[in-house]
Amino acid sequence: MKIADSGDAAALTAVEEACFSRPLNETQISSLLRGENTVFLAVWEGERIVGSVWLQTVLDEGYIGNVAVLPAFRRQGIADALLSALDDLAEERGLRFLTLEVRAGNHPARCLYEKHGYLPAGFRPGYYSAPKEDAVLMTKEFEHAE
């Protein structure tokens, strides 16, 4: 696993396209990679990115965007490793909490997030399209917060 940089935008886009019905495009990813408050983590298999996640921070809060693992590499611990790495980043940066959205019907992802200490914190009705679905907001608080 490594922190992705601007040269990884096309590979990150390919992962997004393989994982989501409404993926981020390369322009959006490039913009996020240039942001000083955003970090992309990528898991590599040889020369190929097989999993990624991005974290955007504002003051002492973190927002997790798009935990993505290529279908052929799922259920191998990659998402677990990405979430654990985000915990480390949150601790290093002194974040009070991390927040994410997940499709209400994506039970495997919701179970994964719960396993990592994320708790439901609210809903966003009709948040997702293609297909239309509610989002569940999930949050994880960190004990180092004062």
Which residue ranges define each predicted feature?
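Conserved hydrophobic beta-strand within the GNAT/NAT acetyltransferase core sheet
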Residues: I64, L98-V102
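Acetyl-CoA-dependent GNAT
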Residues: I3-R74, L83-A85, L89, R93, ...
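Conserved catalytic-core motifs of GNAT/GCN5-like acyltransferases
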Residues: E101, L119-V136
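Short glycine/proline-centered loop/turn elements that form peptide/ligand docking sites
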Residues: L83, N106-A109, G126-P131
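Terminal substrate-recognition subdomain of acyl/acetyltransferases
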Residues: K132-E146
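Short hydrophobic clusters on alpha-helical segments that form packing/core surfaces
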Residues: L86-A90, L98, A109
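Conserved active-site tyrosine of GNAT-family acetyltransferases
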Residues: Y113, Y118
